[in-house]
């Protein structure tokens, strides 16, 4: 059960990182197409912050899982 939960969480976090990276690419490639975000720079910064948040969670979970594997 632990492995299923850990794998699921790692996949979820990796997916969220990819999701927010894709949003940044969309903003960079066609900023005029995003009408609800008049401040493109702020929108990009917000997406980068979300990406960093999920990336950090992914890294921390990986460290926890590596530590638990070493402990037995």
Residue ranges and their predicted role:
Residues 1-72:
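Extended, charge-rich alpha-helical interface modules
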């Amino acid at each position: 059960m632990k492995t299923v939960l850990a794998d699921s969480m790692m996949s979820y976090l990796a997916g969220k990182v990819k999701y927010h990276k894709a949003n940044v690419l969309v903003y960079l490639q066609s900023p005029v197409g995003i009408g609800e975000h008049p401040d493109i720079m702020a929108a990009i910064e917000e997406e980068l912050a979300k990406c960093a948040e999920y990336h950090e969670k992914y890294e921390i979970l990986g460290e926890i899982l590596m530590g638990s594997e070493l402990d037995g």
